[in-house]
Regions:
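An interfacial alpha-helical scaffold signature
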Residues: 1-195
Length: 195
């Protein structure tokens, strides 16, 4: 049984803890950089209520996230890039490549990574490129709208269970069953800004 003193201590310790995802108007400025999304996810991890989840889904509807991808290029393009790097090493170092624009001969494919936990597969996305930590060093990073990432996850050859946001810091899974619901929510930016 909680005593009156213990109840007061518990309430006092929660004074600075947010328990509700903010219901303020969502703006591009608010979503920029991913910190608002990260904050909303943290609140949902502490206090997963129906209202918090709905507010998070509204935020996701208009959010841009980061997707780790493997770059697949043709043998011709790969050989050209290897030659460029080799020439740079022989003629002053890799710093000489800074600012150089590369043109490819063939199509370059960006293949999103898939994480596996037991028999389940998850599509990883991140609120910012920094949230990828060391994991991100092995991949190219592309910024995508959340709805585009949901389509990539849904159409993946693996049976993806959901999208895991910030998998290596504060992981939060958006189940694949919610993708359609999020896509059906109205954009906070009107028709001109939606995907």
């Amino acid at each position: 049984m909680l005593t009156k003193d213990l109840s007061k201590k518990i309430l006092k310790s929660d004074v600075d803890v947010e328990n509700s995802v903010p219901d303020e108007p969502i703006t591009m400025e608010l979503l920029k950089g991913g910190s608002f999304l990260k904050r909303a996810i943290g609140i949902c991890k502490r206090n997963l209520t129906r209202m918090n989840m709905i507010r998070l889904m509204k935020i996701l509807r208009d959010s841009w996230i980061w997707v780790p991808c493997r770059v697949i290029m043709s043998d011709t393009d790969y050989a050209a890039m290897e030659k460029l790097v080799k020439d740079a090493q022989e003629n002053g170092g890799l710093d000489s490549l800074v600012g150089i624009t590369l043109s490819n001969q063939d199509n370059i494919r960006m293949i999103p990574d898939i994480l596996q936990k037991g028999d389940e597969f998850f599509f990883p996305v991140f609120s910012s490129a920094e949230e990828m930590c060391e994991y991100g060093e092995r991949f190219s990073k592309i910024e995508k709208h959340f709805l585009e990432a949901a389509n990539l996850a849904r159409n993946n050859e693996k049976n993806v269970k959901g999208i895991v946001i910030n998998a290596f810091t504060e992981p939060f899974v958006i189940p694949s069953e919610l993708f359609e619901m999020i896509a059906g929510m109205p954009s906070n930016f009107g028709k001109n800004r939606s995907v």
